[in-house]
Amino acid sequence: MTVPASTAPQVPPQQDPQVPHPQEPREEPHEEPPSPPAAPRPQSRGADTRALTQVLFGQLKGLQPGTREHERVRGALIEANLPLVRYAAARFRSRNEPMEDVVQVGTIGLINAIDRFDPERGVQFPTFAMPTVVGEIKRYFRDNVRTVHVPRRLHELWVQVNAATEDLTTLHGRTPTTPEIAERLRISEDEVLSCIEAGRSYHATSLEAAQEGDGMPGLLDRLGYEDPELAGVEHRDLVRHLLVQLPEREQRILLLRYYNNLTQSQISAELGVSQMHVSRLLARSFARLRSANRIEA
C-alpha cells in the first residue's frame, strides 16, 4: 500500500552538531614587577652608620672586656666603620702600595680608636677616629716602605739575597762575601751588589749611624752647621755701608764704642767732651742709622 507523501512521517532534518567555539583567553591584567628599593644615598648611609655606632658603643660600655659578647659588639663596631678606613686609605693611592695592605694597617688604627673612644665626651666617633687611622697609615709608610722605588724583579731578588746571606752567615759564622752569595743563588756578583744597594732604599739611614770603615764619622758629624759669625759679618757690612753717611765725629764715636769697646767715660776723655754729650751723640747716631736703614730697605 502506498502511503501518501503528505501522511508519511516526516524525518526531522539532521542538524550538524554545534561545535563550541574555543573561548578567547582572557588577558590577565599586566602587573609590573616591583622595582627594587632605591639605594640609600651616601648621606643616609653615613647617618645610619653613625646611629649604629652610637648604639653599639652604648652596648659596649656595659660589657666586660674579654667576654664573648664584648668581642661580638667590638667586631660589629669594626665592621660598621670599615668604610671610614677605606676612605682614609684612598688618600694614599699614589704611594704604589697594595690597597689591601693599606686598609689592613688603617684597620689597626680603627681598632685602637675604638678601644680608646669615650662616647661621653660628646665627640663624633669618625671625627675622633680619623686622625688615628691616618696616623697609623703614615707610620706604616714611614717605617716599612722603601723611600726609592725598586723594580719588582730586583725586589724579589733582594729577598733571596737576604735569605741567602742569613743562611751563609749561620753556616760559616761570619758575613758571607759577594762571590759566595752569587754562587749560592747562581747569579752574577753585579746582581748581588745591585740587590744590596736596592735593599738600602727600604729604610732611611740614621744620621747618627756609623759609616763603613774604622774611624769613619757618622753622617751627622759630616753635615755642615751654621757659623754664628755669619750674622755678625752681615751686620758689620750693613753698618759699614750706613756708617759713611754719618758725620765724621759720630762715626768716630761709634767706632770707639763698638769696635774698640770703650765706655762712654773713656770716649769723653778721648775726645775731650762730657760723658753726657757722648751719650747724646750716640743716641743721635742711632736715630740716623735707623732712618737710613729704613730708607735702604
Curated annotation (Swiss-Prot):
One of its GO terms (biological process) is DNA-templated transcription initiation. The gene is sigF. The lineage of its organism: Bacteria, Bacillati, Actinomycetota, Actinomycetes, Kitasatosporales. The keyword DNA-binding applies. Gene3D superfamilies: 1.20.120.1810, Winged helix-like DNA-binding domain superfamily/Winged helix DNA-binding domain. This is RNA polymerase sigma-F factor. GO terms for molecular function: DNA binding; sigma factor activity. PANTHER family: RNA POLYMERASE SIGMA-E FACTOR, SIGMA FACTOR F FLAGELLAR. Keywords: DNA-binding, Sigma factor, Transcription, Transcription regulation. Sigma factors are initiation factors that promote the attachment of RNA polymerase to specific initiation sites and are then released. This sigma factor is required for normal spore maturation. Belongs to the sigma-70 factor family. SigB subfamily. The keyword Transmembrane helix does not apply. InterPro entries: RNA_pol_sigma-70_dom, RNA_pol_sigma-B/F/G, RNA_pol_sigma70, RNA_pol_sigma70_r2, RNA_pol_sigma70_r3, RNA_pol_sigma70_r4, RNA_pol_sigma_r2, RNA_pol_sigma_r3/r4-like. A motif (Polymerase core binding) lies at residues 101-114. Residues 1-46 are annotated as: Disordered. It comes from the Bacteria. Residues 23-33 have a biased composition (Basic and acidic residues). Residues 264-283 bind DNA. NCBIfam families: SigBFG (TIGR02980), sigma70-ECF (TIGR02937). Signal peptide: none annotated. Residues 10-22 have a biased composition (Pro residues).
